[in-house]
Amino acid sequence: MKPIAIIGGGITGLTAAFELEQLGVSTTLFEAADRVGGVIQTVRDGEFLAEYGPNTILETSPLIGDLVRDLGLEDRRIYSSEQAEKRYIVRNKRPVKLPGSPLEFLLTPLFSYRAKARLLLEPFIRRAPSEMEESLASFVKRRIGREFLDYAINPFVAGIYSGAPENLSVREAFPRLYALEQRYGSLILGQILGARERRRKGGVSRKNAPKFSFDEGLETLIQSLGEKLKKNIRTGQTIIGITRQNGSWKVKSDTDTRRPDEEYSGVLLALPAFRLAELQVTCESRKVNLSMLSRIEYAPVASVVLGFHRKDVEHHLDGFGALNPEVEKLHSLGTIFSSSLFPGRAPDGQVLLTSYIGGLRAPHLVTKTPDEICALVIEDLRVILDVRGEPTFKRTCFYPRAIPQYDVGYGRFKQFMTSLEQNESGLFFAGHCRDGVSLGDSIVSGHEAAGRIAANLNIST
């Protein structure tokens, strides 16, 4: 059997390659950069351990735990501390704990009494027609009011998509929220009844899903996959075209001319949308144009990782982190209390904070110099967390096109990729522009793509 070509060496492509190899399907993985792993980057500097990209994996699917087990990493996996369940939202420039129970909700200063009273009307608001596509902002204002948009949804959207609720499609970006209204006619009733159904089926919600990393950070996962697949990986290979002729596929690289005639039984494209749009695809002498995918917008983000002496931070840092609503007029999108999540992230007597800046809220900030960006983040931290003194550790990383935006109308892009899979034999798509933007989503996407490829090859999974 001819191997499968996998284009893209992020976590999706790596997962797909590993799962296919487990099924006895040989693969060749092509990655344009000189390393695999994409945005997952962990840096060890002395006793500081910094994550430039994601900080945690949310274990929303058993497939994620299966991958960890199959790689033999269970002994190195560490779950977040109990206090990480606590989250803060900034209001009036101060972090306020997000309520975790009905009583806390009634007492919280995060929302006004008027907003709380408005919430009581939510079960009586009619559901929108199923064929209607609505922005997240419109959906939230209609069902629970403007204040919840400003002080709950807006900051969480910044934390997940670095995007704008006014642009995001509730159906595409938050399908579970959309499904609650469509199935139960109410978000509140849906949460109650949905929780009962999950308990009965043994399922877990994203809110209650455990969060984990590894003793040496998330790049542990990448290193393990890279080691298992090292004979299959070709880094520094930018694929500029793929061709199917007489049922077999060939790939064309801008640099590698060693094996131009190597044939594959299928191709998995695990690339960001802007790279897919540039790819030249030919199927049995027919040009397949992917340029429409260039219209998918990506949010630019810079991550800023700072260490401070514990005595120089007044806040207890007893939680996952703090998110900054846009109405608060701060520079940064939010801050993760990295050293509170997992042990071994900072030296004794010091703390590590990871902040994010830019997004569609302020894309111009990502163009500033590292020193300028650090200064803006530190300015925010002095206000929000009462940080004093100067940082003992400082790192900045830029992602000009970090996160795809599942905006209103995004369904046409997903349908386009699905249609090509169905109509072009041996061509497959996976990754964050198709199956969700979280790290867990990307792992599941790679696993499921491997399953589709195996089914296409008539291999039992």
Language-model region placement:
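N-terminal Rossmann-like FAD-binding beta1-loop-alpha1 element of flavoenzymes
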Residues: 2-29, 454
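Mid-domain catalytic core of redox enzymes
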Residues: 23, 235-353, 360-367, 371, ...
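Dinucleotide-binding Rossmann-like beta1-alpha1 core, especially the glycine-rich loop
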Residues: 46-128
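Glycine-rich FAD pyrophosphate-binding loop
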Residues: 21-45
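Active-site/ligand-binding neighborhood in enzyme catalytic cores
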Residues: 117-241
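Conserved Rossmann-like nucleotide-cofactor binding loop
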Residues: 12, 35, 274
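Conserved flavin/dinucleotide-binding core of flavoenzymes
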Residues: 99-102, 248, 317-319, 333-461
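Short, well-ordered coil/turn residues at beta-beta hairpins
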Residues: 60, 142-143, 270-271
